[in-house]
Amino acid sequence: MSTDLNAATPPQAPLGRFDGRVQFDEWVRLSLRVAAAEGWRELVLCEADFHGWPLGDREMLETLNQWAGGSRAGGARKCIVLCANFESVRLRFPRFVQWRTRWEHLLDCRQISVRNAADVPSVLWSQRWMMQRVDVERSRGIASDDVQFCVEWREKLGEWITSRSRPGFPATILGL
């Protein structure tokens, strides 16, 4: 009788450097599985237009459902989504748009005001861990659980949240 050791091993957030779209996608999915499993209370997703993120991926949305659903049992959860171009998100990721509607009470979507989209950081942040795409075009970057690194990035993201963005990407669009 064989046993699957991986089934008993909880996922761990990836650390170090990543290189390429495939690895970036894998690390985003894995980090969100860890967020769901460990009950991370706050997430910040920041990107100019989320092109190159696996936001339309069924597996990722199921993981986001698990993370969001944990708010019932494990305390309040919050996800801040910072984006310069939500119209691109709306067109490219209809499944994510539907997910956003279901969990609107946990999401704070903010429209970034910026002249150059390249100035917007590409970051997935939590209090315990974060990942930054330093080279968006080639999907290269770093993931770290260093406390100081996470604190510094929370301060940078706080600046974007409070001074350089406004509420955006409503869950429903009301019309006449």
Regions found by a protein language model. Give the residues of each.
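PLD/PLD-like phosphodiesterase catalytic module centered on the HKD motif
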Residues: 1-44, 48-176
